[in-house]
Structure formats: C-alpha cells, structure tokens
UniProtKB/Swiss-Prot annotation:
InterPro entries linked: Enolase, Enolase-like_C_sf, Enolase-like_N, Enolase_C, Enolase_CS, Enolase_N
The entry's keywords: Cytoplasm, Glycolysis, Lyase, Magnesium, Metal-binding, Secreted
Gene Ontology biological process terms in this record: glycolytic process
Family statement drawn from the similarity comment of this UniProt entry: Belongs to the enolase family.
Keyword Cytoplasm attached: yes
GO cellular component: cell surface; extracellular region; phosphopyruvate hydratase complex
Localization per record: Cytoplasm; Secreted; Cell surface
Species name: Clostridium acetobutylicum (strain ATCC 824 / DSM 792 / JCM 1419 / IAM 19013 / LMG 5710 / NBRC 13948 / NRRL B-527 / VKM B-1787 / 2291 / W)
Note on how the cofactor is bound: Binds a second Mg(2+) ion via substrate during catalysis.
Protein name: Enolase
Annotated PANTHER family: ENOLASE
Coiled-coil residue windows: none
Catalytic site: 208, 340
Catalysis: reaction(s): (2R)-2-phosphoglycerate = phosphoenolpyruvate + H2O
Length: 431
C-alpha cells in the first residue's frame, strides 16, 4: 500500500440542503480514480463566533443564499494548491487551506468551501484504503457507539410556537446497545405523535424532525415527553432521560433573559434557578446553551450550581473553537462541548477541539445542523473519537435518519467489539 497517494482533482458544486437552501458539495479524486465526496451542513441559530459560511447575497439567486463564490474558491483557489498533495496528509492539507484563507474566521474562502474539501479528502483516503471512515480517523480503538440525543419537541428559532426553549430531546442512556437505543427513541417518537394528536395538538415536523405543538410553557414540553416515554413502556430517569437546548442567546436581551412565550424576564441568577428547579423536578441529564454565549458570569453560576449533576453543553459558547473552549476550561465553565464541523471549518481543528475537551474531562457531543444533507460523516466521526454522544435530530426526515442508519451499519461492522456506554458516556457528572 503506497504511503503517498496523489490528489489529481478537487471540484465543488452547489447542491441543496434539507431546507431547500444551496450548500457546497466537494469531490476529491486520487491518482487511481478513487473519489471521496462530502457535503456541508448549515445552521439556523448560529453563534456569532462561528466561522463564516460564504453566501453570494445575490437576491436574484436562491433569495441571496447561493454559494457559487464558495464553489469557485474550491475549484479555482483551493484545487490549485491541493492537486499533487498526498491525500494522507490531512493536517498539512487543512493547514494549507488555513494559510490560503489567512483570516481569523475563514471569511475569505468560506468555512463551507474549506470544510467540504477537508471532509472529502478524508473520505477519499478511507476509500483508497478500502476501510470505513471511522476506522481511518480513529484506528483500531474506534469502537464506542453513541447515545443519541434526539430532538422530538421544538420551540424557539426552530418553530413557530409559544415555546421559548429551542429543543427538547430524549436520551436513551439506559439502553443496552445503540440499536436498542434507536428503537426505544423511535417508539417514544411514535407514541408522542399519537399523544399530541389525542390532545388536538399540531404534529407537523420541524427542520430536525421534531414536533412543534403550541404548548403553554417550556415545562409542559417536558411533561408531555415524559408522558410519551411512560406510555411507550419506558421508565423516565432509568431508561430514558431528558436533554434540553434552550439556545438562550436567542432570547438574551440587554443582559436579561426574555422568555416571551411565558411573559417573563429573568436575570442570570434567576435563570440559573429556573434550570435548577427543572433539574430537581425532572430527569434532565443534559442542558445545552443554558446561558448566552457572552454571559460568562452566568455560565459560571450555572456550572457551580448544577454542573456536578447535569451535563452542561457549550454550543454558541464554544463554537467548536479551541480558543473559546480553553477559556471555558480555565474558568471552570460548562463540562461539555457541542461539536459542529461547520462552526470551525476543517477536520483537523474539529479533532483538536474534541481532544482538548476530552483531556479536560469535558464530554464532546457530535452534532448535525438544522440544514443538513445526506452526508453521514458525523456518524463516523462520533465513533472515531469515542465521543459517546450524538445529536442528530428526530428519527424522521431522511437527512437525519441517514446518520442513524450509518451508525447501525457501524455497530454491525464492529460486532462484538462495539461498545455502548449508556450512562457511562456522561463521565463529566456524578450519576
């Protein structure tokens, strides 16, 4: 097997994501004709510190959302530099793109252009070797199947309803295996749908496959999910746990948390107490973006108050960025990071963020975006780094289900070696 395999072509095209918005797809071709292909997701609630997703802003095309400039950046600028390079030099390839871009936030080439190339390179390398992507990225030690964090009720930016918190999720941490975890989630999802129908509530699905019923409060969303869990034959707090993503930056105004759906405005201290009370009352195991991305003091209060018993995930807070994560670790803020490839824009930087988190005793939760494609890289990535948790939507809508189906294939391929850690995936909290 050759150790230097030349990249002979790099090409990008514009395709559509799951929200009918254009996104970037890249193909990397090797000297023997092997092709690696990857496409890039896009978020709805984006943190201000995320790497730049380059869009054309040409109102005559896709309402300004086209990505032809990013495509050109791949086909003209990046391709020229990468052709002739060794496909196995992932770090050098990513470094080369960072140097060509030269900006702090990837605003010249676009994180969407760079990520498409970065992932397609890794895919091409795995294809050439005839191994799965998770094996290529993680080696023989890649064996942990993740606990799903499934978004089944939506509010906030992901829905047109009275619920302020953006996502209410279930986590089947009591399941014995990934496939059983997936089954239990699907059963709860169907049961929830019937339950909503019986109450005369809306069952149309949102961007990530979750339901967006018009409930009276955030607490009602938790209650209705727990009712569905019990009805489906599972025990809350033993088989199935609740995870929430309030996405609080979205309702943080002038230093206060403005919950419009509930008609309440809270200080950081009061908001922490709202969460502490919910955690006391319900089997909540994970809370993402409980405080706003710039409310470091609020985050510290939250971590000190409930950080020993609940996973506190930084998404907008950390944006998969080692500089921001490093600050969080030093301040003792949060105990987990959400990993979104397109927040940072290269595979190398993503792996660095995961490694930094794990070394500090933080968990890493690998995540989709609300605008997705059929690309399943995150399924391989989560197993490659043994992260133990994945957030990739409801068990509905093919761009979500594709990720779960890929994990079923990986579980099957690993066979006896496959591990499902369940509650032990939460090594950052006391159980």
């Amino acid at each position: 097997m050759k150790s230097y395999v030349e990249i002979v072509d790099v090409m990008a095209r514009q395709i559509l994501d799951s929200r009918a918005n254009p996104t970037v797809e890249v193909e990397v071709v090797l000297e023997d004709g092997t092709v690696g292909r990857a496409s890039v997701p896009s978020g709805a609630s984006t943190g201000q510190f995320e790497a730049v997703e380059l869009r054309d802003n040409d109102k005559a095309q896709y309402l300004g959302k086209s990505v032809l400039n990013a495509v050109d950046n791949v086909n003209e600028t990046i391709a020229t530099e990468l052709i002739g390079m060794n496909v196995f030099d992932q770090t050098l390839i990513d470094q080369t793109m960072l140097e060509i871009d030269g900006t702090e936030n990837k605003s010249k080439l676009g994180a969407n252009a760079m990520l498409g190339v970065s992932l397609a390179v890794a895919r091409a390398a795995a294809e050439y070797l005839g191994i799965s992507l998770y094996q290529y990225l993680g080696g023989v030690n890649a064996k942990v199947l993740p606990v799903p964090m499934m978004n089944i009720v939506n509010g906030g930016k992901h829905a047109d309803n009275n619920v302020d918190f953006q996502e209410f999720m279930i986590m089947p941490a009591g399941a014995p295996s990934f496939s059983e975890a997936l089954r239990s989630c699907a059963e709860v999802y169907h049961t929830l749908k019937s339950l909503l129908q019986s109450k005369g509530l809306e069952t149309a699905v949102g961007d990530e496959g979750g339901f967006a019923p018009n409930l009276n409060s955030n607490e009602e969303a938790i209650q209705i999910i727990l009712e569905a869990v019990t009805k489906a034959g599972y025990e809350p707090g033993k088989d199935m746990f609740i995870a929430m993503d309030p996405a609080s930056t979205e309702f943080y105004e002038n230093g206060k948390y403005n919950l419009k759906g509930e008609g309440k405005v809270y200080t950081s201290e009061e908001m922490v107490e709202v969460y502490a009370n919910l955690v006391e009352k319900y089997p909540i195991i994970s809370l993402e973006d409980g405080m706003a991305e710039e409310d470091w003091d609020g985050w510290k209060l939250l971590t000190d108050r409930i950080g020993d018993k609940v996973q506190l995930v930084g998404d907008d807070l950390f944006v998969t960025n080692t500089k921001r994560l490093s600050k969080g670790i030093q301040l003792g803020v949060a105990n987990s990071i959400l990993i979104k490839l397109n927040q940072i824009g290269t595979l190398t930087e993503t792996l660095n963020a995961i490694e930094m988190a794990q070394r500090a005793g933080y968990t890493a939760v690998v995540s989709h975006r609300s605008g997705e494609t059929e690309d399943t890289t995150i399924s391989d990535l989560v197993v490659a780094v043994n992260a133990g948790q994945i957030k990739t939507g409801a068990p509905a809508r093919t761009e979500r289900v594709a990720k779960y189906n890929q994990l079923l294939r990986i579980e099957e391929e690993l066979g006896e070696v496959a591990e499902f850690r369940g509650l032990n995936a939460f090594y950052n909290i006391k159980k």
